Protein backbone atom coordinates (compact mmCIF):
# COMPACT_ATOMS: atom_id res chain seq x y z
CA UNK A 1 0.00 0.00 0.00
CA UNK A 2 1.44 3.30 -1.09
CA UNK A 3 0.76 6.32 1.11
CA UNK A 4 3.19 8.70 -0.59
CA UNK A 5 0.48 10.37 -2.69
CA UNK A 6 -1.31 11.46 0.49
CA UNK A 7 1.65 13.08 2.24
CA UNK A 8 0.21 16.52 1.48
CA UNK A 9 -2.40 16.04 4.21
CA UNK A 10 -1.33 17.44 7.56
CA UNK A 11 -2.04 14.84 10.22
CA UNK A 12 -3.07 14.92 13.86
CA UNK A 13 -1.24 11.94 15.37
CA UNK A 14 -3.26 9.96 17.90
CA UNK A 15 -0.34 9.11 20.17
CA UNK A 16 -1.04 5.40 19.57
CA UNK A 17 1.71 4.00 17.39
CA UNK A 18 -0.31 1.17 15.87
CA UNK A 19 -3.33 3.36 15.09
CA UNK A 20 -1.16 6.05 13.51
CA UNK A 21 0.40 3.32 11.35
CA UNK A 22 -3.08 2.20 10.25
CA UNK A 23 -4.09 5.78 9.42
CA UNK A 24 -0.84 6.57 7.65
CA UNK A 25 0.26 9.10 10.27
CA UNK A 26 -2.97 10.10 12.04
CA UNK A 27 -6.25 11.88 11.33
CA UNK A 28 -6.24 14.65 8.69
CA UNK A 29 -6.47 17.88 10.67
CA UNK A 30 -9.41 20.31 10.95
CA UNK A 31 -12.01 17.60 10.44
CA UNK A 32 -14.61 15.84 12.59
CA UNK A 33 -14.42 12.10 13.29
CA UNK A 34 -16.85 9.65 14.86
CA UNK A 35 -15.52 7.01 17.27
CA UNK A 36 -18.09 4.25 17.91
CA UNK A 37 -17.87 1.44 20.42
CA UNK A 38 -19.56 -0.39 23.26
CA UNK A 39 -19.04 0.76 26.86
CA UNK A 40 -15.60 -0.33 27.99
CA UNK A 41 -14.19 -0.61 24.47
CA UNK A 42 -11.63 2.16 25.09
CA UNK A 43 -13.17 5.26 23.51
CA UNK A 44 -12.37 7.54 26.46
CA UNK A 45 -8.83 6.16 26.67
CA UNK A 46 -8.29 6.84 22.96
CA UNK A 47 -9.67 10.37 23.37
CA UNK A 48 -7.29 11.13 26.24
CA UNK A 49 -4.29 9.79 24.33
CA UNK A 50 -5.33 11.90 21.35
CA UNK A 51 -5.41 15.08 23.46
CA UNK A 52 -2.19 14.23 25.32
CA UNK A 53 -0.37 13.73 22.03
CA UNK A 54 -1.50 17.21 21.05
CA UNK A 55 -0.12 18.62 24.31
CA UNK A 56 3.17 16.87 23.63
CA UNK A 57 3.27 18.64 20.27
CA UNK A 58 2.50 22.03 21.81
CA UNK A 59 -1.23 22.04 21.01
CA UNK A 60 -4.08 22.85 23.39
CA UNK A 61 -7.05 20.55 23.83
CA UNK A 62 -10.59 20.57 25.21
CA UNK A 63 -12.41 17.53 26.60
CA UNK A 64 -16.16 18.26 26.69
CA UNK A 65 -17.92 15.58 28.71
CA UNK A 66 -21.54 14.75 29.31
CA UNK A 67 -20.99 11.09 30.21
CA UNK A 68 -18.39 11.41 32.99
CA UNK A 69 -17.53 14.04 35.56
CA UNK A 70 -14.23 15.88 35.61
CA UNK A 71 -13.18 13.95 38.70
CA UNK A 72 -13.89 10.63 36.99
CA UNK A 73 -11.78 11.65 34.01
CA UNK A 74 -8.91 12.67 36.27
CA UNK A 75 -9.14 9.30 38.05
CA UNK A 76 -8.81 7.53 34.69
CA UNK A 77 -5.80 9.67 33.80
CA UNK A 78 -4.14 8.93 37.16
CA UNK A 79 -4.67 5.19 36.63
CA UNK A 80 -2.64 5.45 33.42
CA UNK A 81 -0.07 7.82 34.91
CA UNK A 82 -1.08 10.72 32.67
CA UNK A 83 -0.86 14.39 33.67
CA UNK A 84 -3.72 16.45 32.27
CA UNK A 85 -1.90 19.78 32.20
CA UNK A 86 -2.65 21.54 28.94
CA UNK A 87 -6.10 19.93 28.60
CA UNK A 88 -9.21 21.92 29.51
CA UNK A 89 -12.02 19.73 30.83
CA UNK A 90 -15.47 21.14 30.10
CA UNK A 91 -17.88 19.35 32.46
CA UNK A 92 -21.25 19.72 30.75
CA UNK A 93 -23.10 17.84 33.48
CA UNK A 94 -22.74 20.89 35.71
CA UNK A 95 -24.16 23.12 33.00
CA UNK A 96 -27.03 20.72 32.37
CA UNK A 97 -28.04 20.62 36.03
CA UNK A 98 -28.27 24.40 36.09
CA UNK A 99 -30.94 24.44 33.41
CA UNK A 100 -34.59 24.66 34.24
CA UNK A 101 -36.90 21.74 33.68
CA UNK A 102 -38.57 23.41 30.72
CA UNK A 103 -35.28 24.07 28.93
CA UNK A 104 -34.00 20.50 28.70
CA UNK A 105 -33.96 20.63 24.91
CA UNK A 106 -30.71 21.06 23.03
CA UNK A 107 -31.87 22.98 19.97
CA UNK A 108 -28.92 24.13 17.90
CA UNK A 109 -30.22 25.50 14.59
CA UNK A 110 -27.75 25.67 11.69
CA UNK A 111 -28.29 29.41 11.52
CA UNK A 112 -26.84 29.56 15.09
CA UNK A 113 -29.72 31.82 16.13
CA UNK A 114 -30.72 29.73 19.10
CA UNK A 115 -28.33 27.76 21.26
CA UNK A 116 -28.99 25.59 24.27
CA UNK A 117 -27.09 26.44 27.40
CA UNK A 118 -25.27 23.12 27.28
CA UNK A 119 -23.98 23.65 23.76
CA UNK A 120 -23.20 27.28 24.50
CA UNK A 121 -20.82 26.17 27.26
CA UNK A 122 -18.88 24.13 24.69
CA UNK A 123 -18.76 27.00 22.20
CA UNK A 124 -17.67 29.49 24.86
CA UNK A 125 -14.92 27.16 26.06
CA UNK A 126 -13.62 26.59 22.53
CA UNK A 127 -13.58 30.31 21.78
CA UNK A 128 -11.81 31.02 25.06
CA UNK A 129 -9.16 28.28 24.82
CA UNK A 130 -8.79 28.23 21.01
CA UNK A 131 -7.82 24.52 20.99
CA UNK A 132 -6.37 22.53 18.12
CA UNK A 133 -8.04 19.33 19.34
CA UNK A 134 -11.50 18.77 20.82
CA UNK A 135 -13.21 15.67 22.19
CA UNK A 136 -16.98 15.49 22.73
CA UNK A 137 -18.02 12.63 25.06
CA UNK A 138 -20.60 11.53 24.22
CA UNK A 139 -23.23 11.86 21.52
CA UNK A 140 -25.53 9.45 23.34
CA UNK A 141 -26.17 12.00 26.08
CA UNK A 142 -26.63 14.74 23.48
CA UNK A 143 -29.16 12.52 21.74
CA UNK A 144 -31.13 12.26 24.97
CA UNK A 145 -31.08 16.01 25.50
CA UNK A 146 -32.27 16.71 21.96
CA UNK A 147 -35.18 14.24 22.30
CA UNK A 148 -35.80 14.60 18.59
CA UNK A 149 -33.72 12.97 15.85
CA UNK A 150 -34.11 15.93 13.50
CA UNK A 151 -32.91 18.43 16.11
CA UNK A 152 -30.10 16.08 17.02
CA UNK A 153 -28.82 15.80 13.45
CA UNK A 154 -29.16 19.52 12.86
CA UNK A 155 -27.10 20.11 15.97
CA UNK A 156 -24.36 17.73 14.81
CA UNK A 157 -24.29 19.42 11.40
CA UNK A 158 -24.03 22.85 12.99
CA UNK A 159 -21.25 21.64 15.30
CA UNK A 160 -19.40 20.32 12.28
CA UNK A 161 -19.63 23.68 10.51
CA UNK A 162 -18.57 25.54 13.63
CA UNK A 163 -15.55 23.36 14.40
CA UNK A 164 -14.40 23.32 10.79
CA UNK A 165 -14.35 27.10 10.84
CA UNK A 166 -12.47 27.01 14.14
CA UNK A 167 -9.63 24.88 12.66
CA UNK A 168 -10.16 22.12 15.24
CA UNK A 169 -9.68 18.38 14.87
CA UNK A 170 -12.66 16.87 16.67
CA UNK A 171 -13.45 13.38 17.97
CA UNK A 172 -17.10 12.61 18.67
CA UNK A 173 -17.55 9.58 20.92
CA UNK A 174 -20.68 7.48 20.65
CA UNK A 175 -21.95 4.07 21.67
CA UNK A 176 -21.86 1.48 18.94
CA UNK A 177 -25.41 0.24 19.42
CA UNK A 178 -26.98 2.86 17.13
CA UNK A 179 -27.00 0.62 14.10
CA UNK A 180 -28.23 2.14 10.90
CA UNK A 181 -27.39 5.75 11.85
CA UNK A 182 -25.77 6.26 8.48
CA UNK A 183 -26.70 9.94 8.40
CA UNK A 184 -24.47 10.62 11.39
CA UNK A 185 -21.64 8.63 9.81
CA UNK A 186 -22.01 10.55 6.56
CA UNK A 187 -21.76 13.89 8.39
CA UNK A 188 -18.31 13.10 9.75
CA UNK A 189 -15.04 12.99 7.84
CA UNK A 190 -14.14 9.58 9.22
CA UNK A 191 -15.55 6.74 11.32
CA UNK A 192 -13.61 4.49 13.69
CA UNK A 193 -15.34 1.36 15.05
CA UNK A 194 -14.32 -0.34 18.30
CA UNK A 195 -15.54 -3.88 18.98
CA UNK A 196 -15.13 -6.25 21.89
CA UNK A 197 -16.19 -9.86 22.37
CA UNK A 198 -16.01 -12.22 25.31
CA UNK A 199 -15.01 -15.79 24.38
CA UNK A 200 -16.24 -18.80 26.29
CA UNK A 201 -12.93 -18.83 28.14
CA UNK A 202 -10.23 -16.20 28.51
CA UNK A 203 -9.95 -12.45 28.39
CA UNK A 204 -12.00 -10.11 26.24
CA UNK A 205 -10.89 -9.75 22.65
CA UNK A 206 -10.90 -6.23 21.24
CA UNK A 207 -10.47 -5.09 17.68
CA UNK A 208 -10.94 -1.87 15.73
CA UNK A 209 -11.75 -1.01 12.16
CA UNK A 210 -11.42 2.21 10.21
CA UNK A 211 -14.78 2.34 8.47
CA UNK A 212 -13.90 5.41 6.45
CA UNK A 213 -11.60 8.42 6.29
CA UNK A 214 -12.23 10.68 3.34
CA UNK A 215 -9.38 11.54 1.03
CA UNK A 216 -6.68 9.23 2.35
CA UNK A 217 -5.60 5.63 2.08
CA UNK A 218 -5.53 3.54 5.23
CA UNK A 219 -5.00 -0.07 6.23
CA UNK A 220 -8.34 -1.77 5.98
CA UNK A 221 -9.81 -4.66 7.92
CA UNK A 222 -9.81 -5.48 11.61
CA UNK A 223 -6.85 -4.77 13.87
CA UNK A 224 -6.47 -6.21 17.37
CA UNK A 225 -5.81 -3.98 20.35
CA UNK A 226 -5.56 -4.20 24.13
CA UNK A 227 -6.17 -1.68 26.91
CA UNK A 228 -3.24 -1.69 29.30
CA UNK A 229 -1.75 0.66 31.84
CA UNK A 230 -0.50 3.48 29.66
CA UNK A 231 -3.33 3.35 27.14
CA UNK A 232 -4.35 1.49 24.01
CA UNK A 233 -1.83 -0.75 22.29
CA UNK A 234 -2.89 -1.49 18.72
CA UNK A 235 -1.47 -4.33 16.64
CA UNK A 236 -2.07 -3.54 12.96
CA UNK A 237 -3.06 -6.49 10.83
CA UNK A 238 0.11 -7.91 9.34
CA UNK A 239 0.25 -7.54 5.56
CA UNK A 240 3.42 -8.99 4.06
CA UNK A 241 3.10 -6.85 0.92
CA UNK A 242 3.58 -3.73 3.07
CA UNK A 243 7.10 -4.88 4.02
CA UNK A 244 8.87 -5.77 0.75
CA UNK A 245 12.48 -6.76 1.16
CA UNK A 246 14.90 -9.05 -0.65
CA UNK A 247 16.67 -11.34 1.81
CA UNK A 248 20.27 -12.45 1.29
CA UNK A 249 20.41 -16.25 0.87
CA UNK A 250 22.29 -18.00 3.66
CA UNK A 251 22.23 -21.40 5.35
CA UNK A 252 21.95 -21.85 9.10
CA UNK A 253 23.54 -25.11 10.19
CA UNK A 254 22.32 -27.00 13.23
CA UNK A 255 25.71 -27.87 14.67
CA UNK A 256 24.97 -31.58 14.13
CA UNK A 257 26.61 -32.79 10.88
CA UNK A 258 24.26 -35.76 10.53
CA UNK A 259 21.18 -33.55 10.85
CA UNK A 260 22.57 -31.07 8.32
CA UNK A 261 23.26 -33.93 5.92
CA UNK A 262 19.69 -35.13 6.34
CA UNK A 263 18.48 -31.64 5.40
CA UNK A 264 20.79 -31.26 2.43
CA UNK A 265 23.16 -28.87 4.19
CA UNK A 266 20.91 -27.06 6.67
CA UNK A 267 17.95 -24.70 6.81
CA UNK A 268 18.03 -21.52 4.76
CA UNK A 269 17.21 -18.00 5.85
CA UNK A 270 13.85 -16.79 4.65
CA UNK A 271 12.34 -20.27 4.79
CA UNK A 272 10.09 -22.06 7.25
CA UNK A 273 10.42 -25.52 8.73
CA UNK A 274 7.80 -27.60 10.50
CA UNK A 275 8.82 -30.22 13.04
CA UNK A 276 6.02 -32.75 13.03
CA UNK A 277 5.55 -35.67 15.39
CA UNK A 278 3.80 -37.11 18.45
CA UNK A 279 4.26 -35.77 21.95
CA UNK A 280 7.65 -36.35 23.56
CA UNK A 281 9.49 -37.33 20.40
CA UNK A 282 11.98 -34.42 20.57
CA UNK A 283 10.47 -31.62 18.48
CA UNK A 284 11.10 -28.82 20.99
CA UNK A 285 14.61 -30.09 21.65
CA UNK A 286 15.35 -30.04 17.93
CA UNK A 287 14.03 -26.48 17.70
CA UNK A 288 16.23 -25.49 20.65
CA UNK A 289 19.24 -26.91 18.80
CA UNK A 290 18.67 -24.44 15.97
CA UNK A 291 18.28 -21.58 18.44
CA UNK A 292 21.59 -22.51 20.06
CA UNK A 293 23.34 -22.89 16.71
CA UNK A 294 22.04 -19.55 15.41
CA UNK A 295 23.00 -17.73 18.61
CA UNK A 296 26.47 -19.27 18.48
CA UNK A 297 26.82 -17.88 14.93
CA UNK A 298 25.89 -14.38 16.12
CA UNK A 299 22.25 -14.48 15.01
CA UNK A 300 19.49 -13.38 17.38
CA UNK A 301 16.64 -15.82 17.99
CA UNK A 302 13.12 -15.30 19.37
CA UNK A 303 11.20 -18.19 20.92
CA UNK A 304 7.45 -18.20 21.56
CA UNK A 305 6.30 -21.11 23.67
CA UNK A 306 2.61 -21.85 24.04
CA UNK A 307 2.82 -25.16 25.88
CA UNK A 308 5.42 -24.80 28.64
CA UNK A 309 7.15 -22.16 30.69
CA UNK A 310 10.38 -20.51 29.50
CA UNK A 311 12.10 -21.93 32.59
CA UNK A 312 11.35 -25.52 31.56
CA UNK A 313 12.14 -24.86 27.89
CA UNK A 314 15.53 -23.34 28.69
CA UNK A 315 16.25 -25.90 31.41
CA UNK A 316 15.82 -28.87 29.08
CA UNK A 317 18.20 -27.34 26.56
CA UNK A 318 20.71 -26.57 29.33
CA UNK A 319 20.79 -30.23 30.37
CA UNK A 320 21.74 -31.09 26.80
CA UNK A 321 24.64 -28.64 26.85
CA UNK A 322 23.15 -26.11 24.42
CA UNK A 323 24.04 -23.08 26.55
CA UNK A 324 20.78 -21.22 25.97
CA UNK A 325 20.89 -19.49 29.34
CA UNK A 326 24.19 -17.88 28.40
CA UNK A 327 22.73 -16.76 25.07
CA UNK A 328 19.69 -15.40 26.91
CA UNK A 329 21.87 -13.41 29.31
CA UNK A 330 23.90 -12.07 26.38
CA UNK A 331 20.72 -10.90 24.59
CA UNK A 332 21.35 -13.26 21.70
CA UNK A 333 17.92 -14.79 22.21
CA UNK A 334 14.57 -13.99 23.80
CA UNK A 335 11.85 -16.32 24.99
CA UNK A 336 8.24 -15.50 25.79
CA UNK A 337 5.44 -17.67 27.05
CA UNK A 338 2.22 -17.03 25.16
CA UNK A 339 -1.18 -17.67 26.70
CA UNK A 340 -3.64 -18.17 23.82
CA UNK A 341 -6.52 -17.35 26.17
CA UNK A 342 -5.05 -13.87 26.75
CA UNK A 343 -3.21 -12.96 23.55
CA UNK A 344 -5.04 -12.54 20.26
CA UNK A 345 -3.54 -13.62 16.91
CA UNK A 346 -3.05 -10.00 15.87
CA UNK A 347 -1.21 -9.18 19.10
CA UNK A 348 1.02 -12.22 18.56
CA UNK A 349 1.86 -11.20 14.99
CA UNK A 350 2.66 -7.70 16.26
CA UNK A 351 5.00 -9.12 18.91
CA UNK A 352 6.83 -11.21 16.30
CA UNK A 353 7.14 -8.22 14.00
CA UNK A 354 8.68 -6.10 16.77
CA UNK A 355 11.23 -8.83 17.53
CA UNK A 356 12.19 -9.03 13.85
CA UNK A 357 12.54 -5.25 13.65
CA UNK A 358 14.87 -5.48 16.65
CA UNK A 359 17.12 -7.96 14.87
CA UNK A 360 15.72 -11.49 15.36
CA UNK A 361 16.76 -13.78 12.50
CA UNK A 362 15.40 -17.06 13.85
CA UNK A 363 11.83 -17.38 15.15
CA UNK A 364 10.54 -20.50 16.91
CA UNK A 365 6.82 -21.11 17.47
CA UNK A 366 6.32 -23.95 19.94
CA UNK A 367 3.73 -25.05 19.22
CA UNK A 368 1.21 -24.48 16.46
CA UNK A 369 -1.29 -26.45 18.52
CA UNK A 370 -1.33 -23.64 21.08
CA UNK A 371 -1.36 -21.06 18.29
CA UNK A 372 -4.41 -22.77 16.84
CA UNK A 373 -6.31 -22.40 20.11
CA UNK A 374 -5.92 -18.62 19.79
CA UNK A 375 -8.02 -18.73 16.60
CA UNK A 376 -11.82 -18.78 16.60
CA UNK A 377 -11.87 -21.06 13.56
CA UNK A 378 -9.34 -23.11 11.62
CA UNK A 379 -9.45 -21.01 8.45
CA UNK A 380 -8.30 -17.98 10.41
CA UNK A 381 -5.26 -19.90 11.61
CA UNK A 382 -4.26 -20.62 8.02
CA UNK A 383 -4.74 -17.00 6.91
CA UNK A 384 -2.85 -15.56 9.87
CA UNK A 385 -0.03 -18.07 9.50
CA UNK A 386 0.23 -17.55 5.74
CA UNK A 387 0.66 -13.80 6.19
CA UNK A 388 3.09 -14.22 9.09
CA UNK A 389 5.28 -16.70 7.20
CA UNK A 390 5.27 -14.52 4.08
CA UNK A 391 6.41 -11.54 6.16
CA UNK A 392 9.15 -13.51 7.92
CA UNK A 393 10.34 -14.91 4.60
CA UNK A 394 10.66 -11.42 3.11
CA UNK A 395 12.69 -10.33 6.14
CA UNK A 396 15.12 -13.23 5.72
CA UNK A 397 14.04 -14.93 8.95
CA UNK A 398 14.25 -18.67 9.50
CA UNK A 399 10.98 -19.81 11.07
CA UNK A 400 10.90 -23.11 12.97
CA UNK A 401 7.44 -24.34 13.94
CA UNK A 402 6.52 -27.26 16.14
CA UNK A 403 3.29 -29.19 15.71
CA UNK A 404 2.30 -32.07 17.96
CA UNK A 405 0.32 -34.87 16.38
CA UNK A 406 -2.33 -36.80 18.24
CA UNK A 407 -1.55 -40.38 19.14
CA UNK A 408 1.76 -42.09 19.78
CA UNK A 409 2.04 -45.10 17.47
CA UNK A 410 0.48 -46.50 14.34
CA UNK A 411 -2.12 -45.09 12.03
CA UNK A 412 -3.81 -43.10 14.80
CA UNK A 413 -0.99 -40.51 14.62
CA UNK A 414 -2.43 -37.50 12.82
CA UNK A 415 -2.20 -33.72 12.71
CA UNK A 416 -5.01 -31.56 14.14
CA UNK A 417 -4.84 -29.40 11.01
CA UNK A 418 -2.80 -29.75 7.81
CA UNK A 419 -0.42 -26.81 7.49
CA UNK A 420 2.42 -28.61 5.75
CA UNK A 421 1.73 -26.93 2.40
CA UNK A 422 2.53 -23.54 3.96
CA UNK A 423 6.04 -24.54 5.02
CA UNK A 424 9.17 -24.99 2.95
CA UNK A 425 10.57 -27.93 4.94
CA UNK A 426 8.75 -30.68 6.81
CA UNK A 427 10.72 -32.79 9.28
CA UNK A 428 8.92 -35.90 10.47
CA UNK A 429 9.73 -37.48 13.83
CA UNK A 430 8.40 -40.89 14.83
CA UNK A 431 8.73 -43.57 17.47
CA UNK A 432 9.81 -47.06 16.47
CA UNK A 433 10.52 -50.28 18.31
CA UNK A 434 13.71 -52.26 17.89
CA UNK A 435 15.00 -55.12 20.03
CA UNK A 436 12.50 -54.48 22.79
CA UNK A 437 13.30 -50.77 23.06
CA UNK A 438 11.29 -47.70 22.02
CA UNK A 439 13.45 -45.40 19.91
CA UNK A 440 12.99 -42.24 17.86
CA UNK A 441 13.44 -41.67 14.14
CA UNK A 442 13.80 -38.52 12.08
CA UNK A 443 13.29 -38.01 8.36
CA UNK A 444 12.69 -35.17 5.91
CA UNK A 445 9.61 -35.52 3.72
CA UNK A 446 9.67 -32.11 2.04
CA UNK A 447 12.21 -29.40 1.21
CA UNK A 448 11.32 -26.76 -1.36
CA UNK A 449 14.70 -25.09 -1.59
CA UNK A 450 16.84 -28.08 -2.52
CA UNK A 451 17.52 -31.76 -2.27
CA UNK A 452 17.54 -33.76 0.94
CA UNK A 453 18.20 -37.29 2.11
CA UNK A 454 15.48 -39.85 1.53
CA UNK A 455 16.61 -42.08 4.36
CA UNK A 456 15.50 -42.31 7.96
CA UNK A 457 17.99 -41.60 10.73
CA UNK A 458 17.77 -42.31 14.42
CA UNK A 459 17.37 -39.42 16.85
CA UNK A 460 18.47 -39.79 20.45
CA UNK A 461 17.94 -37.34 23.29
CA UNK A 462 19.85 -38.81 26.15
CA UNK A 463 22.26 -37.80 28.87
CA UNK A 464 23.74 -34.42 28.11
CA UNK A 465 23.47 -34.37 24.34
CA UNK A 466 21.26 -34.57 21.29
CA UNK A 467 22.55 -36.89 18.60
CA UNK A 468 21.51 -38.06 15.14
CA UNK A 469 22.65 -41.43 13.82
CA UNK A 470 23.61 -42.65 10.38
CA UNK A 471 21.16 -43.67 7.65
CA UNK A 472 18.88 -46.57 8.53
CA UNK A 473 17.82 -48.20 5.29
CA UNK A 474 16.05 -51.13 6.91
CA UNK A 475 12.80 -49.23 7.49
CA UNK A 476 9.40 -49.46 5.90
CA UNK A 477 6.05 -47.84 6.69
CA UNK A 478 7.48 -44.36 7.33
CA UNK A 479 4.63 -42.53 5.61
CA UNK A 480 1.89 -44.86 6.83
CA UNK A 481 2.72 -44.06 10.44
CA UNK A 482 3.58 -47.69 11.22
CA UNK A 483 7.35 -47.35 11.24
CA UNK A 484 8.99 -50.78 11.26
CA UNK A 485 12.73 -51.47 11.56
CA UNK A 486 13.95 -54.76 10.09
CA UNK A 487 17.73 -54.29 10.32
CA UNK A 488 20.37 -55.29 12.81
CA UNK A 489 21.51 -53.59 15.98
CA UNK A 490 24.88 -52.30 14.81
CA UNK A 491 23.60 -49.24 12.86
CA UNK A 492 21.63 -48.01 15.85
CA UNK A 493 22.97 -45.47 18.30
CA UNK A 494 24.33 -46.85 21.52
CA UNK A 495 22.25 -46.23 24.58
CA UNK A 496 23.69 -45.33 27.96
CA UNK A 497 21.81 -47.82 30.13
CA UNK A 498 23.53 -50.68 31.88
CA UNK A 499 27.16 -51.62 31.87
CA UNK A 500 29.51 -52.96 29.22
CA UNK A 501 28.80 -52.59 25.54
CA UNK A 502 25.13 -51.65 25.11
CA UNK A 503 25.25 -52.61 21.45
CA UNK A 504 26.46 -56.07 22.26
CA UNK A 505 23.59 -56.38 24.70
CA UNK A 506 21.14 -55.64 21.93
CA UNK A 507 22.54 -58.35 19.77
Predicted regions and their residues:
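Terminal-proximal interaction/regulatory segments of ATP-powered molecular machines
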Residues: 285, 291, 302-305, 327, ...
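Pre-Walker A adenine-sensing motif
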Residues: 15-26, 256-266
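Conserved P-loop NTPase
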Residues: 2-5, 9-10, 93-94, 98, ...
